[in-house]
Every structure is written in structure tokens, then in C-alpha cells.
């Protein structure tokens, strides 16, 4: 494993999985995914973004002890587009935080050279978002 990439809400998943990754794969990187519009770990101010369940406007205490090596920013629009791609092309009915994680993992993989192993987590499901813009006009398979 070369890297683990995930967003954070409470910080529990990123901190806990990050510690386990470092124990098993000491050279692997643990990378936090943050909305580009609210990249708190990068020193930016909290702001509105559309990646539900991620970055609640503060850096949670659990994350302060996480073995983080880097951060990657994902724009809300890129998270939404990746989420829709996961629905359409792979049949994975996930929410935007999962789309953001996949987008970030692919970005990290592209920087690591040939054939990296980058792991992420699909941490939500789409049923929570049926009434949001995630399922707006033009997103259903029958509509193109």
C-alpha cells in the first residue's frame, strides 16, 4: 500500500485507519481529503461547500493526533461529478463524500508514479441525498 486517502468529519475514521495503516505499512502516506472551499488543514477559513459530511467548520480533536502526511483539496464540483460517475459507470450509489474520496485517491495515485496502490473508503450511501442536487435533472441513467 502506498497511500490511504479519506475525508474527515469527526476525524475518527481518518485517525484510526491512519494509525492502522502506519503500523502495517510504515512507508505508506496517510492523506486527508478536504473540500477546496474549506481546506482547514491547509490554514484556510471554513466556507460553504457541497461535500456533505466532511469538514464541519473546525478541525476535530481526533484529527490532531492522526498520522497525516499531506492534504489534498477537492472542489465540490469535482466531488459531485465523480459521485455521478460512480453511480452511472459502476453502479455505486454513494454520496458526495465518497465521490470526493475517490477523486482525491485518483489525484494522489497520478502523482505517485506507475501502478501505485492507493486506498480510500466509500463512507456514505446515496439514499440520504435523493432530495438534493446530486439527483437533479439529467443524472438518472435513463436520462443520459
Task: State the predicted function of each range.
Residues 15-18, 51, 80, 84, ...:
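Predominant activation on well-ordered alpha-helical scaffold segments within soluble catalytic domains
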Residues 4-6, 92-93:
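Short glycine-rich phosphate-binding loop at a beta-alpha junction
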Residues 7-9, 32-34, 119-123:
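Short beta-strand segments
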Residues 18-25, 109:
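Surface-exposed amphipathic alpha-helices with a cationic face
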Residues 7-18, 97-105, 129:
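Short glycine/serine/threonine-rich phosphate/pyrophosphate-binding segments
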Residues 22-96, 133-144:
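Active-site/ligand-binding loops adjacent to catalytic centers
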Residues 57, 106-144:
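Phosphate-binding loop/pocket of nucleotide- and phosphate-handling active sites
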Amino acid at each position: 500500500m502506498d497511500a490511504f486517502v479519506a475525508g474527515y468529519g469527526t476525524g475518527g475514521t481518518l485517525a484510526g485507519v491512519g494509525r492502522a495503516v502506519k503500523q502495517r505499512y510504515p512507508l505508506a502516506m496517510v492523506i486527508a481529503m478536504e473540500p477546496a472551499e474549506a481546506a482547514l488543514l491547509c490554514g484556510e477559513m471554513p466556507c460553504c461547500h457541497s461535500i456533505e459530511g466532511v469538514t464541519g467548520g473546525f478541525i476535530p480533536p481526533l484529527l490532531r493526533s492522526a498520522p497525516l502526511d499531506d492534504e489534498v483539496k477537492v472542489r465540490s464540483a469535482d466531488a459531485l461529478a465523480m459521485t455521478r460517475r460512480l453511480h452511472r459507470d459502476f453502479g455505486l450509489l454513494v454520496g458526495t463524500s465518497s465521490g470526493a474520496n475517490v477523486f482525491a485517491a485518483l489525484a494522489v495515485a497520478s502523482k505517485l508514479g506507475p501502478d501505485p496502490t492507493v486506498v480510500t473508503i466509500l463512507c456514505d450511501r446515496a439514499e440520504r441525498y435523493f432530495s438534493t442536487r446530486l439527483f437533479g435533472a439529467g443524472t438518472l441513467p435513463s436520462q443520459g
